[in-house]
Design a protein with these regions (language model features):
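Extracellular/periplasmic catalytic domains that process cell-envelope and extracellular macromolecules
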Residues: 13-17, 52-54, 68-73, 87-91, ...
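Lectin-like carbohydrate-binding module/patch detector with strong preference for beta-trefoil
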Residues: 394-552
């Protein structure tokens, strides 16, 4: 691995290093770049005729960063339009830059300057928050999977921010600078360049019918796709057992779990798209089963964390279908979801890593003039919280470590009072009040709840006291049956609650992240209401219209 190049790329792609890229070229040539239509047509996934766009020569490209590199201009740089479907745009096109496409003399200077000859600039037209791509790759990094480095770039052509004055263009000149899957990427993520690399676009899969359409990347040691052909035939003949011999299925299980958490509907498992696959061995001319170890590479994360979509273990991809349909492998995926729920999406990571990461991006984006940054940040943060909650609903409810139970509307958490009690009546013993409050900055066990199977439902216990939640028949002044915690006594199933996922109904593998908590005893659900305790704190009571809740 070229350590000097990797260090330069680390500096180049540092999240707080904003690049300025000034492209100079004849206006007619620029118009040809931005307005070019893809060979084969828009959204044609059956194209086998090579590159969809034409490389053109920029007179010069000047590159600098707020921290790295120093302002440097290079002549005769290759520039090509990118994206032939969802992100296609003539007003603000995605771009590939190759600093040595037309000049070998640029190879050494650009390698020393930034570590690579290639840049990929995404227009983010499908993610106007400009947050999701960089957040998604950060999450894959935290998961220990292949990931792209990335940051932001302000890009001008002949002194004008790209897209300025063009109808319908959001945030002219602002681009997401994502590390492409090229030699330095493969070196960093796999430690060598001796394998073969392929790209899967929409509908491409490890099946014979799609073999002709799967593209082989130029860094591959061989370009005849012999290893890919062998793998496809081997899976066709031997199913899951065959797949386990030519794919790193443990790595795939991790990819599968992360696509679940990111709602990556445009990735491999849900749409057979936006995926590279690398044969992580020294490639040979006539491969057999011992010469193949394919690993997946995630790509195209701009449509992750969309609020209208669900967290789902889908089976559009053959590997996903084989894995989900097998009881043992399915259990492995669920176990991986549990593991990532605690590590990548856990409270500590969210507070110490993801919150400052998002805050930093938000500050930069506001400085660029990107609209509605606070609103966009709020929406993405909510998706991160719901991802953790979906991890509980799919991977198993909170155990002895406990978790917050929070209301979707207020984001307040279920709290077991230490000081206020519900008086005993002739029908009911007393108990500690259950209220809702804002989550404190520091973890307090009175806000954490532990679940365990009990009778027809779940016991819901306060981590602080160990006492279970009870559905009482005692009513408040406003007529609502109350909840309380008290010593264990499951008479009349008062301690049993059902946790029911909210939407999609009847889908064992899809989750919104929300749920309702309903008493088996009364059939009423937990509602974060306004009924006051004696000291004016808002109660969580029982109601026929329960609150929509989530775990965090």
């Amino acid at each position: 691995m070229g350590s000097q190049e990797q260090r330069a790329l680390d500096s180049l792609y540092a999240i707080d290093n904003v690049l300025t890229i000034d492209i100079t070229m004849p206006p007619t040539d620029w118009d040809a770049v931005r307005t070019e239509q893809p060979a084969g047509g828009v959204c044609n996934f059956e194209w086998t005729g090579g590159s969809r766009y034409t490389w053109r020569e920029a007179t010069s490209v000047e590159l600098s960063g707020t921290k790295f590199p120093v302002r440097t201009a290079l002549p005769r740089v290759g520039i090509k339009k990118k994206s032939f479907c969802g992100s296609i745009s003539s007003g603000k096109p995605c771009l590939h830059l190759d600093f040595a496409k037309f000049s070998d003399a640029n190879k050494d200077p650009v390698r020393k300057l930034i570590g690579s000859r290639y840049l990929t600039l995404n227009n983010s037209v499908q993610d106007l928050s400009y947050l999701r791509q960089l957040l998604g790759y950060k999450l894959f990094e935290l998961a220990g999977l292949p990931f792209s480095r990335g940051n932001y770039a302000q890009v001008r052509v002949n002194g004008v921010p790209i897209g300025q004055g063009e109808a319908g263009v959001d945030s002219p000149g602002v681009f997401v600078n994502v590390e492409p899957v090229m030699p330095r990427y493969v070196e960093r993520n796999f430690g060598h360049l001796n394998g073969n690399l392929y790209e899967l676009e929409h509908e491409d899969d490890f099946i014979a019918e799609r073999f002709p359409f799967i593209g082989v990347e130029s860094l591959s040691k061989f370009d005849d796709k012999a290893d890919l052909r062998f793998a496809i035939d081997h899976i066709g003949a031997h199913g899951l057992a065959g797949a386990s011999e030519v794919f790193d299925l443990d790595q795939f299980v991790k990819i599968y779990a992360m696509e679940f958490f990111l709602k990556h509907w445009d990735g491999y498992s849900r749409n057979t798209n936006n995926t590279y696959v690398y044969n992580d061995v020294d490639a040979v001319a006539q491969p057999g089963v011992d010469d193949i170890d394919f690993k997946l590479i995630p790509w195209g994360l701009d449509q992750t964390f969309q609020p209208a979509r669900h967290f789902r273990l889908d089976t559009a991809g053959l590997l996903a279908r084989l894995v989900r349909d097998d009881a043992g492998r399915r259990a492995q995926v669920v176990g991986q979801i549990r593991a990532y729920r605690e590590s990548v999406f856990g409270f500590q990571t969210q507070q110490e890593v993801l919150k400052p990461f998002l805050d930093g991006m938000g500050t930069l984006l506001a400085g660029f003039g990107v609209p509605d940054v606070p609103t966009q940040l709020t929406a993405v943060r909510k998706q991160l919280r719901l991802a953790a909650s979906a991890g509980y609903l799919c991977g198993g409810l909170p155990g002895s470590a406990g978790a917050y139970v929070r209301d979707d509307v207020t984001n307040e958490c279920l709290h077991a009072s230490r000081s206020e009690v519900i008086p005993a009546t002739a029908e009911e013993p007393g108990g500690a009040e259950v209220v809702h409050r804002l989550r404190p900055a520091n973890v307090d066990d009175t806000d954490l709840w532990c679940f365990a199977p009990l009778g027809a439902g779940q016991s819901v216990g306060s981590k602080a006291s160990g006492q279970p939640l009870h559905a009482t028949t005692t009513t408040s002044g406003q007529g609502h049956p109350l909840l309380c915690t008290r010593a264990a006594d499951n008479a009349a199933q008062a301690e049993e609650f059902s946790v029911t996922p909210v939407d999609p109904v009847g889908d064992d593998f899809g989750f919104s992240g929300w749920f309702t908590l309903t008493s088996i005893r009364t059939g009423l659900g937990a509602a974060f209401g306004t009924d006051p305790t004696a000291t004016g704190k808002p109660r969580v009571h029982q109601d026929a219209n329960p609150s929509k809740l989530y775990f965090s």
